[in-house]
Amino acid sequence: AVYWRKDRKMQADREAAEHLVQNILDMGEMLLSSGAEVKRVEDTLSRMGAACGAEKVNIFVITASIMATMEFSGGVRVTQIRRISRSPKYDFRRLEALNRLSRECCTGGLLRKSLHKGGAGGTVLEKKLRVWKQGENIRERYLGSLLVTGSFAVYFGGNLSDGLAAAAFAPLICFLQNRFEPFCPNKVTFYSICSFVAGILICVFSRWTGMFRYDRVIMGDMMLLLPGLALMNSVRDVLAGNTISGIMRLTESLIWTGALVVGFMGAIWVVI
């Protein structure tokens, strides 16, 4: 009976530890998908593992996966790997909220309680993470796209009509990003198709109405698709010593940009 109770306790401790590590990996995945740098994600997950009572914490993060091994008291060792298939969508508001939540977990003892009170701390963390898994505010994204495309079209030498035309085509690009991108096998396919479709419509309406210049409108709308932040983050990762992640992000960004240019140039060649 003594051994049976001991085995039951070890099994319960292991299940609580596995659930806790799963929540910590959820945090890491959301940080990466929000645009956090690799070194920052590794540091955050390591601190959260130490805060929950892990005696040894080993975290390895690249842009495509997260690997975590944690050793707890009583000989409980948990190893989990999380595949990151989605490309990051840079949402600094969510990133700030996740950083604040991670500090709350480390300083408030929220994670440590989950190993001693039936996983209550992990449940609380899971509920808080679920709030930020719901995604971004679509209305704010559409409004921001109108401001960005219109202002950049004017900035690149366009007039008021060019800015208004660029803003008019911005909701189409946002709609394709929200509805069509999840069905594409990769970013290259999406960027090629999205830029070609948007370019065709811009050039056709420009020739049909003659009210705006297609090149200025394309330059303004292109700002919604250019992976500028991804490119800069790749350089930052390389300078910070995360060479593998930096090279992966840099290569992806250059390929995406090439697909974007090919799509718009193909549209101009077909129509003009």
Regions found by a protein language model. Give the residues of each.
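Alpha-helical transmembrane segments and their cytosolic membrane-interface
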Residues: 86-162, 249-261
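N-terminal charge/polar-biased segments
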Residues: 2-21, 135-136, 250, 259-272
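Generic detector of multi-pass transmembrane helix bundles and their immediately adjacent loops
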Residues: 206-272
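Core alpha-helical transmembrane segments of integral membrane proteins
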Residues: 134-208
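Soluble N-terminal domains of membrane-associated systems
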Residues: 1-111, 120
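Juxtamembrane/transmembrane-helix boundary motifs in multi-pass membrane proteins
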Residues: 129-137, 157-161, 182-190, 212, ...
